[in-house]
């Protein structure tokens, strides 16, 4: 299992969704930018907290996937199933090891990282993946970059920084208590 020795980690992320340039355009078009922090713990727990441009928090507590949107004052709760397994955070930190779901193909060095191409394995739920291809950028034995190409041509670029591994995370880290008056949607 890739990153087998990493039981938990926390750090910061920046994320961009871009569209490749159309004919006549010189640069890719940035569709969306965000940044925030992440925490994960195996098996199956993570927090992906967006702080900019707006506050949102995605929490996988091992059983459920919770999406907290501060601006909407809304918490959506759903079982941790297919929706979780296809998220970028779950690809890196999920219950199923990245090398069990993807064939890892050496891709060379780019941007100070050693890249591995991610090719979904046909027998590991590739049909459930919204990504046609991707890559993970490694530095010092840790994933620090992720590039995912979806079936519509959009590219998601994620950079991880200030990573701390195997720290002493308390059990309360993955518990979320919504503020009073929040709308709660339970989706089955």
Region locations from a protein language model:
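Short Pro/Gly-enriched beta-strand edge/turn motifs at strand-loop
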Residues: 18-22, 86-88, 115-119
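Gly/Pro-enriched, hydrophobic low-complexity segments
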Residues: 76, 97-188
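Short helix C-cap/helix-to-loop transition motifs enriched in small/turn-promoting residues
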Residues: 9, 41, 45, 66-69, ...
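Acidic/charged, solvent-exposed loop-and-adjacent secondary-structure segments enriched in E/D, K/R, S/T
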Residues: 67-93
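Structural motif
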Residues: 44-45, 64, 140-145
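N-terminal mature ectodomain segment of secretory-pathway/periplasmic proteins
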Residues: 5-62
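A mature extracytoplasmic/lumenal domain signature
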Residues: 15-17, 42-44, 50-54, 62-64, ...
